[in-house]
């Protein structure tokens, strides 16, 4: 997920009515204010509003939109990437300079994040200044101008953004993996293809926003904000584009492999099969399986030697390596498998040892104690992910877009506990028997092909 931060703001919301003043709550007579329960509202136009008044000194508001790269097509690839970088361009209510200078003046922050499914525009700052930040959020998301010369000026930034991201070999592998695993939708890249650099027009940006930034595809989420204020803002200013927008295609899994021979001494390889869509019991089983095999070190600078995958590979290779289970769930599909990093000469033995460990689990070679430990790791990881306001806001927004509702952590933990040992074995069997996808890069002379596993 790419995070881009901008500083900026403006004074009034262009030609529309002034946004309501956000009042800071105060405790009468020194009585401490208690955090409120999460409030959830779905408007008739489909827009979801969720808020939690925690009386924190900082407020955070996020507008989540079903406008990730999966909603692009072959003619407008890279549009969502450029859109992430265009958050501080001139709008109908403020120039680019005014946006940047305004939020900087109040110590605020704008972040734009994106996945293959969604985009999220988030502002945060001192709660007494949330009116300014909220107005800016509304202006950026509902009234962009996308002036041609400003869009053209983003070309160099687009190149740099992609180049920096692709310095990480894992980013390139995950991009290639989705490209080879799917025929459409989820195959679309998070980063603009090179041949599209400088060719995305302001008209394409306007078309994408008009057809995807609609009320029924949005969720407005706030922390440290009154629900009534958030609802009033949504009803007044986020009702400009009705309807469902353009329907996205269902992801079609295909399988295959892509090998990038570049001579690097370290070989990165990911091998996956189609798993399960997010939000169902099977997806929970794959998550438990991921933590059973090893989801990465849980100790800072640790070597993850306690995971089943690491133990298995260590028996078959004396070279340095890193191995973990890979798990990604989307609204209509998912990928599960293994990710290895190894010396080029040892790539074959590392990959085969890791793959054989998953096969062993598929054959029922696991204990109830191991499954319970995996559940505990999964639950701890989930709770820690929603412990911060940033993680909590993201979780609420993602659930609101996916299901139109919110599932509290207690319910999530219950669902994890309900996963049986047999469910984990079944998930492992699905991976072993499923059609595989593979992406690899490095000096691949000793890296096996899919049909050699």
Swiss-Prot record:
Q: Which PANTHER family match?
A: CYTOCHROME B-C1 COMPLEX SUBUNIT 2, MITOCHONDRIAL, METALLOPROTEASE
The PTM entry states: Acetylation of Lys-159 and Lys-250 is observed in liver mitochondria from fasted mice but not from fed mice.
Give yes or no: UniProt keyword Transport: yes
Is the Signal keyword given for this protein? Answer: no
Q: Which PROSITE patterns match?
A: INSULINASE (PS00143)
Cell compartments where the protein resides: Mitochondrion inner membrane
An example of a GO molecular function for this protein is: metalloendopeptidase activity
* Phosphoserine PTM positions: 368
Q: What the protein does?
A: Component of the ubiquinol-cytochrome c oxidoreductase, a multisubunit transmembrane complex that is part of the mitochondrial electron transport chain which drives oxidative phosphorylation.
Expression across tissues: Expressed in neurons and astrocytes of the cerebral cortex and hippocampus (at protein level).
Sorted alphabetically, the Gene Ontology BP terms of this entry are: cellular respiration; mitochondrial electron transport, ubiquinol to cytochrome c; proteolysis; response to xenobiotic stimulus
A Pfam entry, by short name: Peptidase_M16_C
- Identify the gene encoding this protein: Uqcrc2
Assembly notes: Component of the ubiquinol-cytochrome c oxidoreductase (cytochrome b-c1 complex, complex III, CIII), a multisubunit enzyme composed of 11 subunits. The complex is composed of 3 respiratory subunits cytochrome b, cytochrome c1 and Rieske protein UQCRFS1, 2 core protein subunits UQCRC1/QCR1 and UQCRC2/QCR2, and 6 low-molecular weight protein subunits UQCRH/QCR6, UQCRB/QCR7, UQCRQ/QCR8, UQCR10/QCR9, UQCR11/QCR10 and subunit 9, the cleavage product of Rieske protein UQCRFS1.
Q: Which UniProt keywords apply?
A: Acetylation, Electron transport, Membrane, Mitochondrion, Mitochondrion inner membrane, Phosphoprotein, Respiratory chain, Transit peptide, Transport
- UniProt-listed Gene3D superfamilies: Metalloenzyme, LuxS/M16 peptidase-like (3.30.830.10)
Which family does this protein fall into? Answer: Belongs to the peptidase M16 family. UQCRC2/QCR2 subfamily.
Q: What is this protein called?
A: Cytochrome b-c1 complex subunit 2, mitochondrial
């Amino acid at each position: 997920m790419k995070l881009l931060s901008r500083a900026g703001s403006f004074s009034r919301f262009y030609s529309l009515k002034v946004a309501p003043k956000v009042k800071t709550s105060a405790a009468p007579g020194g009585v401490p204010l208690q955090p409120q329960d999460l409030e959830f509202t779905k408007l008739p136009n489909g827009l979801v509003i969720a808020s939690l008044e925690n009386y924190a000194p900082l407020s955070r508001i996020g507008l989540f939109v079903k406008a990730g790269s999966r909603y692009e097509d072959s003619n407008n690839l890279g549009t969502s990437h450029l859109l992430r970088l265009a958050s501080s361009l001139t709008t109908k209510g403020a120039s680019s300079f005014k946006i940047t200078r305004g939020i900087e003046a109040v110590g605020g922050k704008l972040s734009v994040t994106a996945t293959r499914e969604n985009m999220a525009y988030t502002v945060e700052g001192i709660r007494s200044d949330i009116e300014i930040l909220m107005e800016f959020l509304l202006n950026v998301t509902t009234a962009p101008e996308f002036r041609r010369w400003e869009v053209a000026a983003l070309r160099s930034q687009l190149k740099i953004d992609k180049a920096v991201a692709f310095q990480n070999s894992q980013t390139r592998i995950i991009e290639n993996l989705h490209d080879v695993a799917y025929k459409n939708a989820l195959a679309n890249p998070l980063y603009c293809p090179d041949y599209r650099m400088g060719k995305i027009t302001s008209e394409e940006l306007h078309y994408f926003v008009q057809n995807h930034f609609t009320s029924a595809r949005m969720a407005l989420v706030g922390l440290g904000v009154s629900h009534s204020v958030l609802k009033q803002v949504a009803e007044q200013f986020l009702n400009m584009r009705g309807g469902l927008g353009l329907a996205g295609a269902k992801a079609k899994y295909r399988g295959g492999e892509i090998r990038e021979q570049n001579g690097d001494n370290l070989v990165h390889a990911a091998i996956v099969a189609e798993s399960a869509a997010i939000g169902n019991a099977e997806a929970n089983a794959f998550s438990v399986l991921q933590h059973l095999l090893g989801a990465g070190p849980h100790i800072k600078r640790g070597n993850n030697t306690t995971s089943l995958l690491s133990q298995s590979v260590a028996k078959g290779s004396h070279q340095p390596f890193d191995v973990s289970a890979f798990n990604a769930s989307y609204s209509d599909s998912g990928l599960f498998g293994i990710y290895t990093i190894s010396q080029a000469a040892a790539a074959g033995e590392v990959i085969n040892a890791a793959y054989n460990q998953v096969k062993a689990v598929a054959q029922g070679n696991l204990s109830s104690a191991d499954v319970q430990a995996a559940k505990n790791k999964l639950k701890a990881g989930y709770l820690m992910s929603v412990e911060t306001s940033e993680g909590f806001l993201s979780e609420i927004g993602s659930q609101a877009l996916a299901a139109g509702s919110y599932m509290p952590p207690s319910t999530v933990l219950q669902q994890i506990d309900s996963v049986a040992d047999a469910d984990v074995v079944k998930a492992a069997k699905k991976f072993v028997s499923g059609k595989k996808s593979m992406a690899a890069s490095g000096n691949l002379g000793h890296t096996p092909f899919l049909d050699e596993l």
